[in-house]
Amino acid sequence: MAYNYRFAILLVLLSATVGFTAAALKPPVRTLNGNITLNLIWYGKFTPIQRSIIVDFIRSISSVTAAKGPSVASWWKTTEKYKTGVSTLVVGKQLLLENYPLGKSLKSPYLRALSSKLNAGGARSITVVLTAKDVTVEGLCMNRCGTHGSKSSSVNSGAYVWVGNSETQCPGYCAWPFHQPIYGPQSPPLVAPNGDVGVDGMIINIATLLVNTVTNPSPEAVSACTGIFGSGAYPGYAGRVLVDKTSGASYNALGLAGRKYLLPALWDPQTSTCKTMV
């Protein structure tokens, strides 16, 4: 029992929601709902395919296209059960910073400074800063995989989210269950649905932090369900998920352009349970 408890604590650390703890020390994010502009800043080198995986995920959140199975849009609808109500995300401006203008080692204040480079949508916006696999960020792999907060103390500044690509730095910490965990039972990792351990891991963390941002100040939306991706999950086991018959990849949500994603369970405030897609 003591071992299971310790491992459960470890899984909390493995989750991107550790970024929430860090974010809690920053100015609170104002409540966001309605139409929200989501700007993207790509810091470092991302391939066009990597960018499309992430952009397709964001566009899938508010898609009205019916999917033949569990979808990204239906996963997001759980956020409507929170006091913030309906939130529709629209991709705004994108900025590519492939020449590392601030270097390849970033301190935490740099993330907020970078997010201020795009302000489309004003107070009703979230700017997502994404750092490439060769960029080290203060705290990445040590106590967080991403974070979120307000761009500044101004109520009109909007929010920001940061997520790093952990592929070459700590995939067992920030890209589980697509990589064996750093500690605990070494069960075989799941096959990443888009064939990219780093980016598919980023999707989990982006999803986590976007939900935490729009449901703020209700941190339990994802953090209460850490490490759960399907029914029957327990520490070290992601749960029962769907498997692509051709690639063997694991997923639980369908997106636009035929994309498949693995998304974390969300806390359903109406049923007081962790809601999984499958």
UniProtKB/Swiss-Prot annotation:
GO biological process assignments: response to oomycetes
Listed GO CC annotations: apoplast; plasmodesma
Compartments where located: Secreted; Secreted, Extracellular space; Secreted, Extracellular space, Apoplast
Major site of localization recorded for this protein: secreted
Organism domain of life: Eukaryota
Coiled-coil region: none
Positions bearing carbohydrate: N35
Signal sequence segment: 1-23
Keyword entries, A-Z: Apoplast, Glycoprotein, Secreted, Signal
Hydrolase is among the record's keywords: no
Function in brief: May play a role in a brassinosteroid-dependent regulation of growth and development.
Recorded family membership: Belongs to the EXORDIUM family.
Protein name: Protein EXORDIUM-like 4
